[in-house]
Amino acid sequence: MITMKKIISCALSAALLAASSLSLAGCHGARYRDAFAVPDTFDETRHYEITFWAKNDTNKTQTEIYENAIESFEELYPNITVTLRLYNDYGKIYNDVITNISTNTTPNVCITYPDHIATYMTGDNVVVPLDDLFSDPSYGLGGSELKFDSPSFDEFVPQFIEECRLGTNYYAIPYMRSTEACYVNKTYVEALGYELPEVLTWDFVWEVSEAAMARNDDGTFAVNGQMTMIPFIYKSTDNMMIQMLRQQGAGYSDAGGNIEIFNDTTREILREIASHAESGAFSTFKISSYPGNFLNAGQCIFAVDSTAGATWMGSSAPHLDISADKLVDFELAVYPVPQYDTSNMQMISQGPSICVFNKADPQEVLASWLFAQYLLTNEVQIAYAETEGYVPVTLKAQNDPSYLDYLSRAGEDDDLHYAIKIQASQLLLANAQNTFVTPVFNGSTSLRDASGQMIENTAKSVRRGGVVDDEYLDALFEDVKSMYHLDEYGKKDLGPLPKTSVTLLTCLGITWVLIGAYVVYGAVKRKKE
């Protein structure tokens, strides 16, 4: 005889089985990693092979610094072998990491940016949160069991380490820091009848740039006697837009990933840029090429580029990308980027950071952390900072006597002590408190790209005879939203639940109803008895 108890029991089992099946189906293809926990000790009886992905263009000195750091580290830890893989572009590192996440073949240690890390973190326990490693008394920052002199947490430049906090945890350590500088042909500015102010303003740069467009009767430009003159060239237009918005207190994005860039201030900025691009007074790297080349050839007055590119700026620069016969002798000045409010300077902080990827073996992760931490030692920090207009990320290195001696010898030669390079570093050292970074979230890389794309599109449009009006800007905003999928980030209506989720929730609901029915049935039966 089929009893009520059996009916309910069978129905309950079926519902639970269906719910379990759907739950497993929903997880098909997902890769789960256990969260990393710091081991009590580092097992030095085992051998570890770790990979380190880093960026380098053509600077052989930087490559040698990485190689020397690896060699020195392996002498301290002979049971750890570090394999270096160099890239010439951060974007390629980013793409390769994304590709390798799905196959669990990420590198152990990687030079990267917080924007990129935010995307890596969409995977499950992919990037190691470093808080517990920072504070570990044995192997953390300044730990007692380390075989090298590591900085303590308090010896980081505060602004630089805070840039590596994503949400409530630290997911990176800073490696090097730079900012943008405006490299100015002071000779031409004065020839045009102007005197450089203490702080550059956007109004000043635009005015001088337009004045430099005056031509002689033979068609040459009056300021340089050449047929080519682009007074103002910006290398990174995403940074240009970001800083112009920040300086005016306008929206870009918030920490929650809500996109705020499509506002009236952005429209005003683009109209301003359009007017100067139309006259020929302004251009970009993507449109015209590297600003340093035009600057060194006497064909540019204001060249904005990273302080990490200072060795390419000036007619006596250690690195030149044009032939000697094209060089023009001039006095070069190094300034922060132009400002709207000189009493409240705002300049972007940039430069690579280091993240550690999670692995199945906690000992392997600890070995990776030891190497990442070794890159913070004074020897590595100072050597790498001296290759360009970088600054070390620790106060420990910045105050090291050898680094202070290096800074004091600016201009002694046009190589290690190239004056412009050291001035670029000093610019950031003097303005660290004025630096900022943009909010980091999954999608912040796309927003950054979109901010520069709007400037590029605007400049190209007016050069082709287009008109930048409200109709154009409306269309531009919609185009970049679509191109970079910006409607997918921030607060939005997620729409109805997938059918699988609806079915799963229905099964769970039925399960609880049947459980309740079974309890009631039992109570009634006991009462009758």
Label the predicted regions.
Residues 42, 114-179, 221-225, 327-338:
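Hinge/lid segment of periplasmic solute-binding proteins
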Residues 47-51, 56-118, 293:
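Early extracytoplasmic/lumenal segment of secretory-pathway proteins
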Residues 131-155, 198, 223-224, 230, ...:
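Short, solvent-exposed loop/beta-turn-alpha elements that line the ligand-binding surface or hinge
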Residues 162-175, 180, 203-258:
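Extracytoplasmic/periplasmic solute-binding protein
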Residues 208-210, 255-286, 332-333, 337:
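Glycine-centered hinge/linker elements that transmit conformational signals in sensory
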Residues 275-282, 318-396:
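Extracytoplasmic/periplasmic substrate-recognition and gating elements
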Residues 332-339, 385-453, 457:
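Long, aromatic- and glycine/proline-rich binding clefts that accommodate carbohydrate-like moieties
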Residues 420-529:
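Conserved C-terminal helix/tail region of periplasmic/extracytoplasmic solute-binding proteins
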